[in-house]
Amino acid sequence: MPRSWMVTSVVLAAACTVNAAHWATGTTIRVWIDPAGAPAGGDRLVERAMQTWTMAADSRFRMERTAARDTAGIRVHFFTRDWRFGMTQARPDSRTGLLTEAEVVVAADADGDALDHQIVVYLTALHELGHAIGLSHSADSADIMYLFRLPGDSERFFGGYRRRLRSPDDIGTARATGLSPSDVRELRGLYE
């Protein structure tokens, strides 16, 4: 490997570490899902993403849906996709450094068939909720926290997940969580 590539690899690896900010360990994080602009079944896919992170956290925190926007720590909205699939703004408390709220936006539309659409909504919600709980981007394309950087990344990523499914009912189940062992390790390390 040329020396310049090694330096670039080290810089990328350093840039893809876990944030120091996270929610208080043991907390219940209330999540409100905005019905405005939500695709059919979109709220159910976000709930599956919440359950996936809750299971991976292994009692370090719990995500729970709430009907009350004002008391939610995380608020999820849907938007018409531009060049992004989603985005998140997480806010830490200035005194404690702990996360106290986050705004998550997930694309309500996607190219492809109905299954592709469900996959994009679920995996985007999973990725963006990962940011909302304190995780940064990863350089490993096997991770849900992977940052698309190359042409074709999104097709490879979503297509790879689709190949693991037997049916749409597998989305967000133990058979197809969308998390890699590294995602789980990073999460648990952040909340130790």
Question: Could you describe each region identified by the protein language model?
Answer:
Residues 1-2, 64, 148, 174:
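Short, intrinsically disordered low-complexity segments
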Residues 2, 14, 54, 103-107, ...:
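Residue-level signal for functionally critical sites in structured catalytic/ligand-binding pockets
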Residues 24-38, 102-109, 163-170:
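Acidic/histidine-rich, surface-exposed loop or edge segments in extracytoplasmic proteins
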Residues 43-143, 149-153:
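Metzincin-family zinc-dependent endopeptidase catalytic domain
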